[in-house]
Amino acid sequence: DINGGGATLPQKLYQTSGVLT
């Protein structure tokens, strides 16, 4: 997980996959 939280659900899923910074 990159950001660790605070995003909307789909954004959180992408972050967990390491797609978003």
UniProtKB/Swiss-Prot annotation:
Reaction(s) catalysed by this chain's protein: cutin + H2O = cutin monomers
Gene Ontology molecular function terms on file: cutinase activity
More about this protein: On the 2D-gel the determined MW is: 40.2 kDa.
Top-tier EC class: hydrolase
Localization terms from the record: Secreted
Organism (species): Colletotrichum gloeosporioides (Anthracnose fungus)
GO terms under cellular component: extracellular region
Family of this protein: Belongs to the cutinase family.
First-listed, main subcellular location of the protein, grouped into a coarse class: secreted
Enzyme Commission designation: 3.1.1.74
Record bears the keyword Hydrolase: yes
Regulation: Inhibited by diisopropyl fluorophosphate (DFP).
Protein name per UniProt: Cutinase 2
Domain of life, per lineage: Eukaryota
Inducing or repressing factors: By contact with cutin.
Function: Catalyzes the hydrolysis of complex carboxylic polyesters found in the cell wall of plants. Degrades cutin, a macromolecule that forms the structure of the plant cuticle. Allows pathogenic fungi to penetrate through the cuticular barrier into the host plant during the initial stage of fungal infection.
Keywords carried by this UniProt record: Hydrolase, Secreted, Serine esterase, Virulence
